[in-house]
Amino acid sequence: MNDVDAYLLANCGADGRKPRVVCLPTAAGQEGDASVNRWSKMGVEHFTRLGADVVAVPVTDADSANDESHAAAVEEADVVYFSGGNPMYLHQIMKDSLVWKSAQRVWERGGVYAGCSAGAMILGSEVPDFRAMGLRSVPVFGVVPTAFVIPHFDAFPMMWKPLLFALRKRLRAGETLLGVDEDTAVVGTLGGEWTVMGKSQAHLFTKDGERTYAVGETFSLGQ
């Protein structure tokens, strides 16, 4: 994903200086220090190699998400990167928090949201409850105009295929489900077109149809 993230750094509004990246391991907050530290280390090392100034901010629970110093650190970023873990927990901690409000201000001034796995899933309108095989879901931020964002799509085991069927059955007219393959990203702006970047494909499903987009192809959401 080096090419994708290099593109994000080149288009984050840094205006000739080193881009500032904040990595948030929040989605792994229930997994213990070892997991949080692993996600933080991977993010810092990755973006440092790409030439950015990077800091991992230890937002792992409601208290740290409302820490004013953490919120201030996020607000100084050009790229806010949410790593993987539990999307429901990530949404629970971020909702109405000072850190989330700071992140929103970053994007409003032209900065970049980057999300891995859980970090991408919270951008749709809902996150499926995998234990209920898609029959239940939890409302999330709805930033991107699609009902569900499903990462690791090409690695979906056969046993989870009924989940996709259940989610598609729940889609209403005009709603979509966006599946993104591993080592692949969908990059765009709200209200504009989205481009597939990385190594594989993105898949856009409606209740009755589907389209697959290869690297370099563009499409619209919510239209």
Predicted regions and their residues:
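C-terminal and late-domain segments of enzyme folds
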Residues: M1-K18, A27-K41, E45-T48, V127-D129, ...
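General beta-strand structural signal in soluble alpha/beta enzymes
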Residues: V55-P58, Y81-F82, Y113-C116, L177-V180
